[in-house]
Amino acid sequence: LITSDAAKEMLTIEHTYGIPQAALPGTQNFPSDYNYSNEVDRFRMSGYIWTEADQYRERVKQVFDKLLENETVWDPTMVVYEGHRDYERVKTLPWHEKYTVRQLWEAYSPSPGRHATHFFNWKTSDEIAWKRKYQIWMKWIKYFFDNGGTLVAGSDTAFIYALFGFALIRELELFQEAGIHPIDIIKIATTNAHKTLGNIELSNGIRKDAPADLAIIDGNPLDNFKVMYGTGIQSYSEEGLSITQRGGVQWTIKNGIIFDCKKLLHEVRDYVESQKGE
Protein backbone atom coordinates (compact mmCIF):
# COMPACT_ATOMS: atom_id res chain seq x y z
CA LEU A 1 0.00 0.00 0.00
CA ILE A 2 1.19 3.52 -0.73
CA THR A 3 0.40 4.46 2.88
CA SER A 4 3.16 2.24 4.26
CA ASP A 5 5.95 4.80 4.25
CA ALA A 6 3.74 7.81 4.94
CA ALA A 7 2.26 6.18 8.03
CA LYS A 8 5.68 6.09 9.70
CA GLU A 9 5.50 9.86 10.11
CA MET A 10 1.83 9.84 11.13
CA LEU A 11 2.08 10.00 14.92
CA THR A 12 -1.55 11.06 15.39
CA ILE A 13 -4.55 11.29 13.09
CA GLU A 14 -7.85 13.09 13.56
CA HIS A 15 -11.25 12.32 12.02
CA THR A 16 -11.37 9.45 9.51
CA TYR A 17 -10.05 11.06 6.34
CA GLY A 18 -7.52 9.04 4.40
CA ILE A 19 -8.08 5.69 6.06
CA PRO A 20 -10.81 4.23 3.82
CA GLN A 21 -9.42 6.07 0.79
CA ALA A 22 -6.05 4.35 1.28
CA ALA A 23 -7.77 0.96 1.10
CA LEU A 24 -9.42 1.56 -2.27
CA PRO A 25 -7.62 0.08 -5.29
CA GLY A 26 -8.49 3.24 -7.23
CA THR A 27 -10.50 6.43 -6.88
CA GLN A 28 -13.75 6.58 -4.93
CA ASN A 29 -16.79 6.16 -7.18
CA PHE A 30 -17.59 9.88 -7.49
CA PRO A 31 -20.33 11.03 -9.88
CA SER A 32 -19.10 12.82 -13.00
CA ASP A 33 -20.26 16.23 -11.76
CA TYR A 34 -18.65 15.90 -8.31
CA ASN A 35 -17.03 19.09 -7.02
CA TYR A 36 -14.96 18.82 -3.82
CA SER A 37 -15.20 22.59 -3.32
CA ASN A 38 -18.98 22.25 -3.10
CA GLU A 39 -19.45 21.07 0.48
CA VAL A 40 -22.83 19.49 -0.23
CA ASP A 41 -21.05 17.26 -2.76
CA ARG A 42 -18.08 16.72 -0.49
CA PHE A 43 -20.00 15.59 2.57
CA ARG A 44 -22.71 13.78 0.63
CA MET A 45 -20.14 11.53 -1.01
CA SER A 46 -18.23 11.17 2.25
CA GLY A 47 -21.26 9.22 3.45
CA TYR A 48 -20.41 6.44 0.99
CA ILE A 49 -16.64 6.11 1.42
CA TRP A 50 -16.63 3.53 4.22
CA THR A 51 -19.32 1.46 2.48
CA GLU A 52 -17.18 1.40 -0.65
CA ALA A 53 -13.99 0.59 1.26
CA ASP A 54 -15.80 -2.20 3.12
CA GLN A 55 -15.80 -4.15 -0.14
CA TYR A 56 -12.01 -4.41 0.31
CA ARG A 57 -11.88 -5.44 3.96
CA GLU A 58 -8.48 -7.09 3.74
CA ARG A 59 -7.02 -3.88 2.34
CA VAL A 60 -8.67 -1.84 5.12
CA LYS A 61 -7.21 -4.27 7.64
CA GLN A 62 -3.75 -3.76 6.13
CA VAL A 63 -4.08 0.01 6.55
CA PHE A 64 -5.05 -0.37 10.20
CA ASP A 65 -2.35 -2.94 10.86
CA LYS A 66 0.23 -0.48 9.50
CA LEU A 67 -1.14 2.26 11.79
CA LEU A 68 -0.98 -0.16 14.72
CA GLU A 69 2.57 -1.15 13.82
CA ASN A 70 3.62 2.50 13.83
CA GLU A 71 1.77 3.17 17.12
CA THR A 72 -0.30 5.92 15.53
CA VAL A 73 -2.79 7.57 17.89
CA TRP A 74 -6.33 7.99 16.52
CA ASP A 75 -8.81 10.72 17.48
CA PRO A 76 -11.97 9.81 15.49
CA THR A 77 -14.16 12.82 16.50
CA MET A 78 -17.36 10.95 15.65
CA VAL A 79 -19.56 13.54 17.35
CA VAL A 80 -18.86 16.42 14.99
CA TYR A 81 -20.17 14.44 12.01
CA GLU A 82 -23.25 13.05 13.72
CA GLY A 83 -25.53 15.67 12.19
CA HIS A 84 -25.06 13.95 8.85
CA ARG A 85 -26.92 10.87 10.08
CA ASP A 86 -29.65 12.75 12.02
CA TYR A 87 -29.64 16.45 11.24
CA GLU A 88 -32.91 17.43 12.94
CA ARG A 89 -31.86 15.73 16.18
CA VAL A 90 -28.53 17.52 16.58
CA LYS A 91 -30.17 20.84 15.71
CA THR A 92 -32.72 20.44 18.53
CA LEU A 93 -30.53 19.05 21.32
CA PRO A 94 -31.83 20.20 24.73
CA TRP A 95 -28.81 22.32 25.67
CA HIS A 96 -28.85 24.61 22.64
CA GLU A 97 -31.59 26.93 23.90
CA LYS A 98 -29.76 27.84 27.11
CA TYR A 99 -26.09 27.34 26.28
CA THR A 100 -25.55 28.05 22.56
CA VAL A 101 -24.86 31.75 22.11
CA ARG A 102 -26.58 33.57 19.25
CA GLN A 103 -23.37 34.20 17.29
CA LEU A 104 -22.49 30.50 17.37
CA TRP A 105 -26.01 29.52 16.34
CA GLU A 106 -25.68 31.80 13.34
CA ALA A 107 -22.35 30.16 12.49
CA TYR A 108 -24.00 26.72 12.64
CA SER A 109 -26.86 27.70 10.32
CA PRO A 110 -26.80 26.54 6.68
CA SER A 111 -24.87 28.93 4.44
CA PRO A 112 -23.11 28.29 1.11
CA GLY A 113 -20.27 30.59 2.16
CA ARG A 114 -19.23 28.92 5.42
CA HIS A 115 -17.46 25.66 6.14
CA ALA A 116 -19.53 22.76 7.51
CA THR A 117 -22.90 24.50 7.07
CA HIS A 118 -23.95 22.48 4.04
CA PHE A 119 -27.34 21.20 5.21
CA PHE A 120 -29.49 22.58 2.40
CA ASN A 121 -31.20 19.90 0.35
CA TRP A 122 -29.81 17.32 2.79
CA LYS A 123 -31.70 14.15 1.89
CA THR A 124 -33.10 11.10 3.64
CA SER A 125 -30.78 9.04 1.45
CA ASP A 126 -27.81 11.08 2.72
CA GLU A 127 -28.69 10.29 6.33
CA ILE A 128 -29.13 6.60 5.52
CA ALA A 129 -25.71 6.55 3.84
CA TRP A 130 -24.13 8.19 6.88
CA LYS A 131 -25.86 5.78 9.27
CA ARG A 132 -24.28 2.90 7.36
CA LYS A 133 -20.96 4.74 7.35
CA TYR A 134 -21.04 5.02 11.13
CA GLN A 135 -21.72 1.30 11.52
CA ILE A 136 -18.66 0.41 9.45
CA TRP A 137 -16.50 3.20 10.90
CA MET A 138 -17.28 2.06 14.44
CA LYS A 139 -16.48 -1.53 13.53
CA TRP A 140 -12.95 -0.45 12.58
CA ILE A 141 -12.61 1.78 15.63
CA LYS A 142 -13.30 -1.33 17.69
CA TYR A 143 -10.78 -3.33 15.63
CA PHE A 144 -8.14 -0.66 16.21
CA PHE A 145 -8.86 -0.64 19.95
CA ASP A 146 -9.01 -4.44 20.31
CA ASN A 147 -5.61 -4.77 18.66
CA GLY A 148 -3.85 -2.38 21.01
CA GLY A 149 -4.36 0.92 19.23
CA THR A 150 -4.40 4.13 21.25
CA LEU A 151 -7.61 6.13 20.96
CA VAL A 152 -8.24 9.59 22.37
CA ALA A 153 -11.49 11.54 22.71
CA GLY A 154 -11.94 14.79 20.81
CA SER A 155 -14.94 16.67 19.48
CA ASP A 156 -13.84 19.36 16.95
CA THR A 157 -16.55 21.55 18.42
CA ALA A 158 -18.17 24.69 17.01
CA PHE A 159 -19.16 22.88 13.82
CA ILE A 160 -22.43 21.09 12.90
CA TYR A 161 -24.19 21.90 16.21
CA ALA A 162 -21.47 20.28 18.34
CA LEU A 163 -21.27 22.43 21.47
CA PHE A 164 -18.25 22.78 23.75
CA GLY A 165 -18.31 20.39 26.71
CA PHE A 166 -21.54 18.68 25.75
CA ALA A 167 -20.01 17.32 22.54
CA LEU A 168 -17.12 15.66 24.37
CA ILE A 169 -19.55 13.69 26.54
CA ARG A 170 -21.44 12.66 23.43
CA GLU A 171 -18.15 11.41 21.96
CA LEU A 172 -17.80 9.11 24.97
CA GLU A 173 -21.29 7.75 24.27
CA LEU A 174 -20.31 7.09 20.66
CA PHE A 175 -17.24 5.12 21.76
CA GLN A 176 -19.63 3.01 23.83
CA GLU A 177 -21.86 2.57 20.78
CA ALA A 178 -18.76 1.28 18.98
CA GLY A 179 -18.54 -1.50 21.58
CA ILE A 180 -15.86 -0.20 23.96
CA HIS A 181 -16.34 -0.64 27.72
CA PRO A 182 -17.01 2.57 29.73
CA ILE A 183 -13.93 2.03 31.92
CA ASP A 184 -11.75 1.95 28.83
CA ILE A 185 -13.55 5.00 27.45
CA ILE A 186 -12.70 7.00 30.59
CA LYS A 187 -9.06 6.05 30.00
CA ILE A 188 -9.36 7.14 26.36
CA ALA A 189 -10.63 10.55 27.50
CA THR A 190 -8.10 11.10 30.29
CA THR A 191 -4.77 9.32 30.61
CA ASN A 192 -4.55 8.41 26.91
CA ALA A 193 -4.97 12.07 26.02
CA HIS A 194 -2.28 13.18 28.48
CA LYS A 195 0.18 10.58 27.18
CA THR A 196 -0.45 11.71 23.61
CA LEU A 197 0.20 15.33 24.57
CA GLY A 198 3.34 14.39 26.48
CA ASN A 199 1.87 15.33 29.88
CA ILE A 200 3.63 12.48 31.66
CA GLU A 201 2.86 13.81 35.13
CA LEU A 202 -0.86 13.61 34.40
CA SER A 203 -0.86 10.34 32.48
CA ASN A 204 -0.87 7.86 35.37
CA GLY A 205 -4.34 8.54 36.77
CA ILE A 206 -5.41 9.27 40.34
CA ARG A 207 -2.69 8.65 42.91
CA LYS A 208 -1.08 10.24 45.96
CA ASP A 209 0.83 13.48 45.29
CA ALA A 210 -0.45 13.64 41.71
CA PRO A 211 -1.85 16.93 40.33
CA ALA A 212 -5.44 17.23 41.54
CA ASP A 213 -7.28 17.26 38.21
CA LEU A 214 -10.66 15.72 39.03
CA ALA A 215 -14.31 15.94 38.03
CA ILE A 216 -16.85 15.23 40.77
CA ILE A 217 -20.09 14.01 39.23
CA ASP A 218 -23.61 13.51 40.56
CA GLY A 219 -23.93 9.93 39.37
CA ASN A 220 -21.91 7.07 37.97
CA PRO A 221 -20.72 7.66 34.39
CA LEU A 222 -19.69 4.01 34.09
CA ASP A 223 -23.38 3.20 34.37
CA ASN A 224 -24.63 6.12 32.27
CA PHE A 225 -22.47 8.76 30.56
CA LYS A 226 -25.53 11.02 30.42
CA VAL A 227 -25.05 11.92 34.09
CA MET A 228 -22.11 14.07 32.95
CA TYR A 229 -24.22 16.42 30.83
CA GLY A 230 -24.73 19.84 32.36
CA THR A 231 -28.45 19.50 31.65
CA GLY A 232 -28.52 16.41 33.89
CA ILE A 233 -30.94 13.50 33.67
CA GLN A 234 -34.39 12.70 35.00
CA SER A 235 -34.74 9.82 37.45
CA TYR A 236 -37.16 8.44 40.02
CA SER A 237 -36.98 9.93 43.47
CA GLU A 238 -35.84 7.63 46.27
CA GLU A 239 -39.43 6.80 47.20
CA GLY A 240 -40.17 6.04 43.55
CA LEU A 241 -43.21 8.31 43.42
CA SER A 242 -41.90 11.30 41.50
CA ILE A 243 -39.38 12.37 38.87
CA THR A 244 -36.33 14.33 39.97
CA GLN A 245 -33.64 16.15 38.03
CA ARG A 246 -30.10 15.14 38.88
CA GLY A 247 -26.68 14.60 37.35
CA GLY A 248 -24.06 16.89 35.92
CA VAL A 249 -20.48 17.62 36.91
CA GLN A 250 -20.78 19.29 40.31
CA TRP A 251 -17.18 20.31 40.86
CA THR A 252 -14.03 20.43 38.77
CA ILE A 253 -10.67 20.47 40.54
CA LYS A 254 -7.83 21.74 38.35
CA ASN A 255 -4.32 22.09 39.81
CA GLY A 256 -5.90 22.00 43.24
CA ILE A 257 -8.32 24.86 42.46
CA ILE A 258 -12.00 24.03 42.97
CA PHE A 259 -14.54 25.27 40.41
CA ASP A 260 -18.30 25.20 41.01
CA CYS A 261 -19.56 23.82 37.70
CA LYS A 262 -23.21 24.61 38.38
CA LYS A 263 -22.27 28.23 38.98
CA LEU A 264 -20.21 28.31 35.78
CA LEU A 265 -23.15 26.90 33.82
CA HIS A 266 -25.41 29.60 35.25
CA GLU A 267 -22.91 32.22 34.11
CA VAL A 268 -22.88 30.76 30.60
CA ARG A 269 -26.67 30.66 30.54
CA ASP A 270 -26.89 34.29 31.66
CA TYR A 271 -24.40 35.37 29.00
CA VAL A 272 -26.27 33.47 26.27
CA GLU A 273 -29.51 35.11 27.37
CA SER A 274 -27.89 38.56 27.33
CA GLN A 275 -26.89 38.11 23.69
CA LYS A 276 -30.34 37.18 22.40
CA GLY A 277 -31.61 40.72 22.16
CA GLU A 278 -28.60 42.24 20.44
Residue map of PLM features:
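Glycine-enriched alpha-helix->loop->beta-strand junction motifs that scaffold or abut catalytic
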Residues: 7-13, 71, 148
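Active-site neighborhoods of metal-dependent hydrolases
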Residues: 19-178, 275-277
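Conserved beta-strand positions in the central sheet of alpha/beta enzyme cores
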Residues: 12-14, 75, 216
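Alpha-helix termination/capping residues and helix-transition junctions
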Residues: 7-10, 179, 246
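C-terminal cap of metal-dependent C-N hydrolases
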Residues: 211-272
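C-terminal helical cap
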Residues: 119-129, 134, 139, 147-150, ...
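Functional cores that coordinate and move charged inorganic groups
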Residues: 1-10, 17, 24, 36
